[in-house]
Amino acid sequence: MIPAGTVQPWRPASRATYTVLFVCFLAILFEGYDVGVMGAVLPALADDRNWNLTPLELGALRSYALVGMFFGAFLIGTLSEMIGRRRMLLLCVSLFSLTMLGASYAPTPAIFGVLRFIGGLGLGGVIPVAAALTIEYSPPHRRSFNYGLMYSGYSVGILCAALIAMWLLPSLGWRGVIGLGAVPMVLIPLMAWMLPESLEYLVGQGRIAEAQALADRTGHGRLPSQARPANSAARAAWRDVMSSMFARKQLRATACFWIALFFGLLLVYGLNTWLPTIMRKNGYDLGSSLSFLVIFSLASAVGGLFLGGAADRMGARGTVALFYLIGALAIGALMFRNSVAVNYLLVALAGVGSVSASLILTGYLAGYYPAHARAAATGWALSFARFGAMSGPLVGGYVAGSGLSFGWNFITFSIAGLAAALAVALLPSAREPVVVTRGGQQSNAEIA
């Protein structure tokens, strides 16, 4: 964010906000399909006699993309502050779409894993860049809701993966369902035409005239001619980001964000990968076990909007902590012999208390740090959280292959949810230095 003393209030026009939301929604939807399809096809991969994979090997195969996402999040998040958020978002979608096509033809698990790792680089970069663009082009009083709306594309993508797998897996096999992940390549030209560049990036690079022209097209208000990058060395993004995250006054917040997202993504990726398999082990057939993934995804999508609105009204910190707790309790309750209807309800609460809570927490994080470090700080936090994402499928695979009852999977994931809730509850509140209200007035506001 450019210092208040040197910048006239600028507010995005509704058309610009919705355009950015739409493009970022598409990018996140495609990512959700890529991530969700592995869980949807996992039972078919387990039955593939050509590869004969063990449960632990299946979990490892699922984790290759997550390793790539670890590197992609902080590399691309930081690079986007140097070479442009718009360019990096389009590049990331192109990369993971192409590798999905390649993975569908992989002759061996090793080649499949390499392609998934490369695609993971693009997957890891989408979230921090889309988060930064969405927060930047949203009015402050709508940030959490808009972020929830944008990120609901992730759950819609997972839902599409589950529905497509239920419909086409018997006829196309797992290779055909994975190959459909290349479809986004067709929409890249449309996304490139619609998506504006980040004003924060342009100003941070000293491209003031270009930033002003874009500001005139996408919003209301002017950048004064004397505007300069907020930091004294516009291209010293690395030093600025490190200072923004690890200064003494920010250290506790950074630690809490990172720990909460670690356990949050352990939940998200562990449940996305193993929920159909665990429910199948509990006596459900393949179609019924996949239906739990559908419920999980639907609830996550709707829950993101609900939590976003609640966070805008009551504060993100308390809202996210509460729903992590609710999700943990719901996951733990799945270990009991419940009716199908009760299990559907519990899975829905688990979706809201894992995916929805994590996405609202990511949006809160993106607004917590200075604007010039928004994408990079989000990327660094998500990179650390990828250790949790990588652990989720492996933990589920270990428990599934250990001979323990299926209930131990739910106990393990429930503990992760409790840890995430505690970390969010320990987050310090922060004050945004300047918020532009609906009337265009500037005031201090606490981020709760």
Question: Over which residues does each language-model region extend?
Answer:
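Intracellular cytosolic loops and amphipathic helices of Major Facilitator Superfamily
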Residues: 1-9, 194-253, 435-448
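Cytosolic juxtamembrane N-terminal segment immediately preceding the first transmembrane helix
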Residues: 1-33
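Extracytoplasmic gate region of multi-pass secondary transporters
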Residues: 39, 248-304
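Extracellular/periplasmic helix-loop-helix junction of adjacent transmembrane segments
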Residues: 39-71, 288
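Conserved MFS/SLC helix-loop-helix module at the cytosolic interface between two early adjacent transmembrane helices
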Residues: 71-109
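Helix-breaking motifs and short loop linkers at transmembrane-helix boundaries and internal kinks
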Residues: 84, 105-111, 139, 315, ...
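Cytoplasmic helix-loop-helix junction between adjacent transmembrane helices
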Residues: 115-152
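A membrane-interface helix-boundary motif in multi-pass transporters
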Residues: 170-181, 401-415
